A protein has these predicted regions:
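Generic N-terminal amphipathic, Lys/Arg-enriched alpha-helix
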Residues: 1-18
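Glycine-rich, small/polar surface segments that engage phosphate groups of diverse ligands
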Residues: 29-104
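Gly/Ser/Thr-rich loops at beta-strand to alpha-helix junctions
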Residues: 45-50, 112-114, 145
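Surface-exposed amphipathic alpha-helices with a cationic face
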Residues: 60, 124-131
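Glycine/threonine-rich flexible loop motifs
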Residues: 113-123
Length: 194
């Protein structure tokens, strides 16, 4: 069997195994967020950061949700990293944005963060701040053992089909899930061009 056949067979299996109920719960939560006038802050690193930037556009344009990501402000992101450190960059940004109980953060991550291994400490501190401020914590992650999956209010976990492809399939399914959300009849307010 070719690589492409195996890869796409894994993607097909993920579509079947992924919790559709959790995706619908997340759509409900995001609808509630919009109705109460809350803001959505998207956080991620690496490929997930790129996904955050794209998703902000979709949540704003298609769903009418006030959405932001610190990834989109390179000057502030790099200044905070340089001056205060990478581990606090997202929490400091959220603090400066006056994150509050009406708001939510949405984490895009493969592993979701791991305190013991010091993986994505910036996500961990952002989650801790959100919890302290009574903001909702949402996620789309590739591991159910990470900090996001354990601490989040509603977290979509991308099923692991092949350990060699956890990263590419997790990042790909971040896009699949957020596109499902922004086209959800409860959330979508504006039509796409195509």
């Amino acid at each position: 069997m070719s690589h492409a056949t195996q890869f796409f067979a894994s993607a097909e299996m993920i579509c079947k195994k992924l919790s559709h109920e959790t995706v619908d719960r997340l759509a409900d939560e995001l609808t509630d967020l919009r109705e109460r006038g809350g803001r959505l802050f998207l956080l991620g690193v690496g490929g997930s950061a790129g996904n955050c930037s794209h998703a902000v556009n979709d949540f704003r344009k298609l769903c009418g949700i006030e959405a932001y990501s610190p990834i989109d402000n390179v000057s502030e992101l790099t200044a905070r990293t340089n001056d205060e450190g990478w581990d606090t960059v997202f929490a400091a940004w959220l603090d400066g944005s006056r994150l509050n109980r009406n708001d939510a953060i949405l984490i895009f991550s493969v592993g979701g963060g791991d305190a013991e291994r010091n993986v994505s400490p910036n996500l961990l501190k952002a989650i801790d701040l959100a919890k302290k401020r009574s903001a909702k914590v949402f996620g789309i992650v590739g591991k159910d053992t990470g900090y996001t999956a354990k601490q989040g209010d509603v977290v979509v976990v991308v099923p692991q089909i092949n350990p060699a492809w956890v990263t590419p399939l997790s990042e790909a399914f971040q896009a699949v899930v957020w596109h499902c959300l922004v086209s959800h009849p409860k959330l979508q307010k504006n039509a796409t061009k195509w």
